[in-house]
Amino acid sequence: MEALLSIFVESVFVKNMALAYFLGMCTFLAISKKIDAAIGLGIAVVVVLTITVPVNNLMFNYLLADGALAWAGLEGVDLSFLGLICYIGVIAAIVQIMEMVLDKYFPALYGALGVFLPLITVNCAILGAALLMVQREYTFSESVVFGVGSGVGWAFAIVALAGIREKLKYSDVPEGLRGLGITFITVGLMSLGFMSFGGIAL
């Protein structure tokens, strides 16, 4: 249990997807203009990461890894070179299924998140989480916690940036830095702040 808690805290603060690895920066910068939009996208990312990381873990361990097909009588087969394209396929399929389920059973939630769901398919933080999970050789339970933690960390970062950007609208920012200029500086300072968590022994 302590190991799972360590993975969660580490993925939220120490190894934050947005502020430590700089993954998902396209949507991170584009959707962080308003807090409401940032919260919507953050929730969608948490849900998608919570589902896709464990599913990709199962697929890697039972289909792609070296010797994973021993249950089918194919012991010497190693399909790990297909990992990247398979993870992308799983992410796209799960996002599409999620979109259809929300549209049919939760139309109000679909109306709120509908714009963000297609953006998640091409969010590199989702793919990055799957690749990091394989690289770190997480078990299924660890991959679930890592998926949730990575999503929460990314959502926390985008909501924090959106709050700062809303305050910056009323600040006297030099003309040359308005827009993305001051946003890049802000993200850099946020990232420096999150680096302080690197000293935590987990």
Curated annotation (Swiss-Prot):
It is an enzyme of class 7 (translocase). The chain crosses the membrane at residues 11-31, 35-55, 81-101, 114-134, 144-164, 182-202. One of its GO terms (biological process) is sodium ion transport. It is a multi-pass membrane protein. Its main location: membrane. Keywords: Cell inner membrane, Cell membrane, Ion transport, Membrane, NAD, Sodium, Sodium transport, Translocase, Transmembrane, Transmembrane helix, Transport, Ubiquinone. InterPro entries: NqrDE/RnfAE, NqrDE/RnfAE_oxidrdctase, NqrE. It catalyses: a ubiquinone + n Na(+)(in) + NADH + H(+) = a ubiquinol + n Na(+)(out) + NAD(+). It is found in: Cell inner membrane. One of its GO terms (molecular function) is oxidoreductase activity, acting on NAD(P)H, quinone or similar compound as acceptor. GO terms for cellular component: Gram-negative-bacterium-type cell wall; plasma membrane. Its EC number is 7.2.1.1. Pfam families: Rnf-Nqr (PF02508). NQR complex catalyzes the reduction of ubiquinone-1 to ubiquinol by two successive reactions, coupled with the transport of Na(+) ions from the cytoplasm to the periplasm. NqrA to NqrE are probably involved in the second step, the conversion of ubisemiquinone to ubiquinol. NCBIfam families: nqrE (TIGR01940). Belongs to the NqrDE/RnfAE family. HAMAP family: NqrE. Composed of six subunits; NqrA, NqrB, NqrC, NqrD, NqrE and NqrF. This is Na(+)-translocating NADH-quinone reductase subunit E. It comes from Saccharophagus degradans (strain 2-40 / ATCC 43961 / DSM 17024). The lineage of its organism: Bacteria, Pseudomonadati, Pseudomonadota, Gammaproteobacteria, Cellvibrionales.
